[in-house]
């Protein structure tokens, strides 16, 4: 069995894994133990009261966090004509059609988000086997297939997070960086949970948001008392 590092021993001693902490206390604990030499991400895991085996209970969407994610996001847009100009003005990093598709086929994928106008899906559709496994395939459910590409670019650049439950019915995403203030992290988390509540499937029964835990890149998970949000 691997030995625990001094940091992990300190975290285990300082965090009660059986306790749900008041949100401000939970975030203070996270920041206390975020001692990596880089600016750690603050991640959240939300256990949902859904049956992920049923397609009509799967939760997928996107929302813009009020304080962003702290990440610089590179955006590629498949579009043409006036939409291409609008995407450029909105701050898109890469814009094209067949030429951009050829770059993707060559493995040149220096971007984090892919957006497409509906007329470009005939080109993007050919890239499903490349973009799909990387979670980059545009999808109207998360607003990345849209006639308003400029708005989608602005959302991506301003701190939009996409979410999708895993096979255990858990949403994993980020709500910022350890350098954010506790208030910024709290407001980002509240915005995410509000978006999830709106995305509740009509067929989901009982308690929808069952458990919320926050963690940093190299830290332990801290369960949050939802009544404090």
UniProtKB/Swiss-Prot annotation:
It comes from the Bacteria. CDD domains: Ribosomal_L1. GO terms for cellular component: cytosolic large ribosomal subunit. One of its GO terms (molecular function) is rRNA binding. SUPFAM superfamilies: Ribosomal protein L1. Keywords: Repressor, Ribonucleoprotein, Ribosomal protein, RNA-binding, rRNA-binding, Translation regulation, tRNA-binding. GO terms for biological process: regulation of translation; translation. Belongs to the universal ribosomal protein uL1 family. Binds directly to 23S rRNA. The L1 stalk is quite mobile in the ribosome, and is involved in E site tRNA release. Protein L1 is also a translational repressor protein, it controls the translation of the L11 operon by binding to its mRNA. Part of the 50S ribosomal subunit. HAMAP family: Ribosomal_uL1_B. This is Large ribosomal subunit protein uL1. It comes from Actinobacillus succinogenes (strain ATCC 55618 / DSM 22257 / CCUG 43843 / 130Z). The gene is rplA.
């Amino acid at each position: 069995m691997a030995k625990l590092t001094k940091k992990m021993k300190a975290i285990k001693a300082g965090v009660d894994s059986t306790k749900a902490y008041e949100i401000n206390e939970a975030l203070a604990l996270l920041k206390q133990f975020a001692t990596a030499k880089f600016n750690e991400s603050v991640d959240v895991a939300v256990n949902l009261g859904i049956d992920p085996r049923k397609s009509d209970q799967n939760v997928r969407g996107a929302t813009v966090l009020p304080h962003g994610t702290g990440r610089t996001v590179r955006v590629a847009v498949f579009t043409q004509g006036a939409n291409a100009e609008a995407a450029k003005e909105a701050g898109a990093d890469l814009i094209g059609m067949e030429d951009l598709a050829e770059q993707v086929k060559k493995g040149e994928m220096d971007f984090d988000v892919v957006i497409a106008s509906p007329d470009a899906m005939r080109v993007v559709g050919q890239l499903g086997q490349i973009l799909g496994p990387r979670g980059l395939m545009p999808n109207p459910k998360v607003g990345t297939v849209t006639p308003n590409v400029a708005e989608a670019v602005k959302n991506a650049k301003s701190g939009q997070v996409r979410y999708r439950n895993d096979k255990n019915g858990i949403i994993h995403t980020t709500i910022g960086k350890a350098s954010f203030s506790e208030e910024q992290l709290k407001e980002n988390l509240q915005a995410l949970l509000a978006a999830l509540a709106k995305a509740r499937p009509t067929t989901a029964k009982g308690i929808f948001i069952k458990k919320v835990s926050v963690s940093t890149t190299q830290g332990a998970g801290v369960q949050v008392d939802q009544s404090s949000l």
